[in-house]
Amino acid sequence: KLLNYDLFLAKDFLKLQVSDTKKVFEKKLLNSFKEKSLFDTKLNCFIHLFDEQIFHVDDNTIIEGILQSEEYLRPSIDIINKYIKLKDKKNSFLNRENTCILNIRGGEYKRHRELILPKSYWLNAMANMKRFKKKIDFKIVTDDFAYASTLFPSIEIIKGGIKEDFMNLFFCKYAILSNSSFGYFPIKLGTPPDIVIAPNHWARFGNKYERWASPSNIYKDWLWQDKNGEIRKPAEIEKSKFDLKRIYASYNVYTTEDFFKKKTLKDFLPKKFRNLLKRLLSKLFPLYVGYLKK
């Protein structure tokens, strides 16, 4: 059962195997389970780890969390194709043989500058892709047309909404991804691309501590590019996972995420005014202010 399924933006083109979405549940009558997380004070963010307790929750329990570890997908990752399918698999999109899709994330990410990938990441990734595939064209899908076109005015941005972005990634043979879960699902649900390049350390790309945020986002068969444009060896990625388990084993203080939330000026502004202001500023300063594309 998915709560608030009507708010799921991809419901028009994805078919999810879910129970009755019209049935109303009284939250106060349900149990609650939250995926275990910890706060990394050096990276200044929450780290979500695989939480084995999820396999032991009772019925009638609301499950909350990031839930991005592939260890939840048992017996294997292939199980997602049982529960999530395209409503129409007709490939009416670009010829993928010599095309690489760049999934550039802007929008709300610009509120959190540590999430925005530097231009050098994309330039290095395109250079790396050309080493693997000499004859290749690049196209962009993005949630922020103004931001992406400012970064790369000479690269074509594929127009459309969330469906077009998803489908172009679903059918692609080559992809360069941002640190966003949006790119994960079409890549994993579609025919596996020949090459996928993604940012090392994910949500804290190039951090000086050489830590992943979060280790749940380390996915098999992808190439992980560091801040210097180097593709990290699989053995180095595995060592990172091992080191993180050792580091986080020493964390032992539990609290709620609300404890870390701080109010800012925007919290005191009416939502309607915030949206209007954000839209205006995103047009004036596309590299610094984001407005989420609907």
Language-model segments: residues:
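Donor-binding and catalytic core of enzymes assembling or modifying cell-surface/extracellular glycoconjugates
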Residues: 123, 129-215
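Hydrophobic beta-strand segments of well-ordered beta-sheets in folded domains
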Residues: 1-2, 61, 98-100, 135-138, ...
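Catalytic binding pocket for nucleotide-activated donors in carbohydrate/polymer assembly enzymes
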Residues: 188-260, 268
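Secretory-pathway luminal glycosyltransferase catalytic domains
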Residues: 2-133, 233-292
